[in-house]
Amino acid sequence: MKIIYKDGHVDECPQDQELHVIRHTAAHIMAQAIKRLYPQADFAFGPATENGFYYDVDLGDQKLSDEDLANIEKEMRKICKENLAIKPFILPRAEAVKLMEERKENYKIEHMADLADETEFSFFQQGEYVDMCIGPHLTYTKALKAFKITQQSGAYWKNDKENKMLTRINGVAFRNQEELDAWEKEQQEARERDHRKIGKEMGLFMTDDLVGRGLPMFLPAGYTCLLYTSPSPRDTERSR
């Protein structure tokens, strides 16, 4: 698998780094898709993670539905088919800040200010999209073969609750479709074993957001099970 580094040289990717590079590139492609669909998007951080990737983004007042996430994934697939070359470049601080100002990347500008000792910054570009990044990345968008957007959540900028809550969009990416299919199968099996699903199906308990998420209310069958599985006061006394 070929990858490109921030200095522009291309080399084979070490096998133990393949998933990291794939997922990091997937984060960039997802950000490009988001920017195409939501031009007002202002991006924070978008790293690869142990299990996938995410990007934190300020969408203003825009709220995303499941259909919106599906459309973002669809746009990602379109970008992959466009087979855009991923190219790095480096700018001195003043030019880098100016570029981010022109692109209205306010969170990137703030992050650059935090890196006061840096005299230059590296960027990666694919088509119209530019992201501040140290890389490395896949050489073309078409090299991203298997991915899926999984969920959205909230995340504070810089993990500080005093800062603005951003939208975090998560995804997974793998070397090929077979690995993605295996992951999806594992997720389905885990859902089937989930005690919350089994308990509701067996009529053991119910939940209500008005009571509180994660707080089960036992139904008669569940209460009976609880009585049989909980130690009696006599058993507790004997164990002392």
Where are these regions (language model features)?
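Mixed-charge, low-complexity segments
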Residues: 204-213
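Non-catalytic interaction/regulatory segments
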Residues: 2-9, 49, 59-154, 160, ...
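N-terminal catalytic cores of NTP/NDP-binding nucleotidyl/phosphoryl-transfer enzymes
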Residues: 7-40, 45-47, 58, 137-139, ...
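Short, conserved phosphate-binding/catalytic loop or strand-edge motifs used
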Residues: 48-54
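Hydrophobic alpha-helical scaffolding
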Residues: 16, 20, 24, 62-66, ...
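N-terminal low-complexity segments that are often proline-rich with Ser/Thr-Pro
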Residues: 236-240
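Conserved small/polar residues in nucleotide/adenosyl-binding loops
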Residues: 228-235
